Design a protein with these regions (language model features):
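Short amphipathic alpha-helical "interface-anchor" segments enriched in bulky aromatics
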Residues: 124-130, 340-372
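Electropositive nucleic-acid engagement tracts
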Residues: 33-47, 63-136, 140-143, 242, ...
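Electropositive, glycine- and tryptophan-enriched low-complexity nucleic-acid-binding patches
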Residues: 63-65, 84-85, 148-232, 311, ...
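Domain-level cores of phosphate- or acyl-group-handling catalytic modules
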Residues: 195-275
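Short, amphipathic alpha-helical "recognition" segments used to contact nucleic acids or chromatin
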Residues: 50-64
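Active-site-proximal, Lys/Arg-enriched surface segment
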Residues: 3, 91-183, 187-192, 302-305
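A short, flexible helix-boundary coil/loop motif
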Residues: 1-47, 77-78, 180-182, 187, ...
Length: 475
């Protein structure tokens, strides 16, 4: 007999894990089974999709890094499903992971913002992070460049382009696309795992997305989010994305419903200012000559602020500033010319929330740690990490936890402590049964004789095996 989701919940109830209160209760609040049905993830036979995903969602909280690890741990008793059931789901190119992530994101907003109020600083935030891997046999893996690491920043992996939605209080991941960069040498490409996908399947479309450049990918993410009913006030990106075409496309969505606030490179691009056409450097010289430099005490920065004409877009506001201990001027752009410097910086600083989200996803929720060679399994792994992030984010907002890290540590510590207590209790129960059997058989127990019996040796072996297991699991 297979177990359904309610039976998994009963197992966790019996163990008294905090994970039950946090994950199973949140899944119930989200009505996760219905969300899976809405996303079109119905299976014809066997275990239900929501049952399998429920197991996968719990992996980071059970400190398990793979399906294989589940069946070598004490947690295997949580379910009777075979590991091939989980592998088949992760490797299935037909699964609409993107649709499922949107269903969870919509439900999250429905729960935390039932009035559907749009905050003044609500924003789409687009940024990328490197999912580093060891080896080159994983499907579609390439050499990617980490600009933070500089010249030595090339490594095997993927660029994970993520769209986050900031609702005024917290960020939630809406969508993502995995991108490849520099192709590997021909010899290494031959050794890579290759999979033939059904044309126009979800997995096939994901592979096509991976070949697109990041600016095109970012625009697709934003337009898809708007179609799914998300429409914030601003779009926040760094200077890498702010090409002329990108800005024009953002302003063209819903007749200019969203404004762009972004960093922009101080390069060759020209701006119209007081009848002159100037690039960034000449504009700084002109503004300095006019004595328009200001100082902001709140941010401890010197800056210029002016409205210019950007060909192909119209009037925009530029903010040219130099932070303490920096030699170069940094330039920010806003298509909302009503924003002063302080307000612009307050809105742009919201972009930092996506960096915090990346850190929490990688540090606690196993983002980028999928060990499978199958590209579909990589997509599944990222999606599940983001779903778990929203579950924990909802619990945190409802229970006033300050950080995701603090919440995760609470779950992990409680889980490990109660798991150890449960194992010791099961051991004691088994030992007690052995002693009862001996007494029942002999009527009484002679201690010296008992120490030489098979039952005593069995008890000793149980203890040694249990504590050795505890020790290795704590390493």
């Amino acid at each position: 007999m297979r177990q359904d989701l309610s039976e998994i919940k009963l197992v966790l109830d019996r163990h008294g894990y905090s994970i039950n209160n946090i994950i199973c209760d949140v899944m119930k609040k989200f009505n996760f089974k219905t969300l899976c049905w809405k996303a079109g993830t119905v299976k014809n036979s066997g275990y239900g999709f929501s049952e399998i995903v429920a197991i996968l969602v719990m992996f980071p909280l059970m400190l398990l890094k793979s399906v294989h690890a589940l069946y070598r741990s004490e947690f295997e008793k949580v379910t009777e499903m075979k590991k091939d059931t989980i592998y088949r789901l992760k490797n299935n190119e037909r699964i609409p992971w993107r649709r499922l992530l949107y269903c969870v994101a919509k439900k999250y907003q429905e729960l935390v913002n039932p009035q559907k109020e749009v905050a003044e600083n609500s924003a789409f935030i687009v940024d990328d992070t490197i999912d580093e891997r060891v080896g080159y046999e994983i499907e579609n893996i390439t050499a990617v460049h980490d600009h933070v690491a500089g010249k030595k920043g090339n490594k095997y992996g993927f660029k994970n382009l993520v769209l986050g939605f900031f609702d005024g209080k917290s960020i939630s991941p809406l969508d993502f696309s995995i991108h490849t960069e520099k192709s590997l040498p021909k010899k290494k490409r031959k050794e890579q795992f290759k999979k033939e996908c059904i044309k126009n399947s979800n997995g096939f479309k994901r592979r096509e997305d991976s070949k697109k450049d990041k600016i095109t990918g970012a625009l697709l993410l934003i337009k898809r989010a708007v179609k799914n009913g998300f429409l914030p006030k601003y779009v926040l990106v760094d200077s890498w994305f702010t090409s002329l075409a990108f800005i024009k496309n953002i302003r063209g969505i819903k007749n200019g419903a969203m404004h762009l606030v972004a960093g922009i490179r101080n390069d060759f691009r020209k701006y119209g200012y007081n009848g002159q056409t100037l690039n960034g450097k000449k504009l700084i010289i002109q503004l300095s000559a006019e004595g328009k430099q200001k100082r902001c005490r709140k941010w401890n920065v010197r800056y210029f602020e002016t409205v210019v004409h950007y060909e192909g877009i119209g009037d925009v506001k530029l903010y040219i500033c130099r932070f303490p201990y920096q030699k170069k001027w940094r330039v920010f752009i806003s298509t909302d010319i009503s924003l002063d410097f302080v307000k612009m910086m307050e809105i742009y600083s919201v972009r930092w929330t996506v960096e915090v989200m990346f850190r929490e996803l990688k540090q606690h929720l196993q983002l980028g740690e999928c060990q499978s060679r199958d590209f579909d399994a990589q997509i599944a792994s990222v999606t599940i990490s983001m779903i778990l992030y929203m579950f924990l984010s909802y619990f945190r907002r409802m229970n006033a936890y300050e950080t995701m890290g603090g919440l995760f540590e609470l779950i992990k510590d409680d889980l490990c402590e109660k798991n150890l207590a449960q194992r010791l209790w099961e051991l004691f129960d088994e030992l007690l049964q052995v002693v009862i059997d001996v007494i029942t058989k002999n009527g009484s127990v002679d201690i010296s004789s008992f120490r030489n019996s098979h039952e005593y040796l069995y008890i000793k072996e149980l203890f040694e095996r249990s504590f050795l297991s505890n020790h290795t699991n704590s390493l």
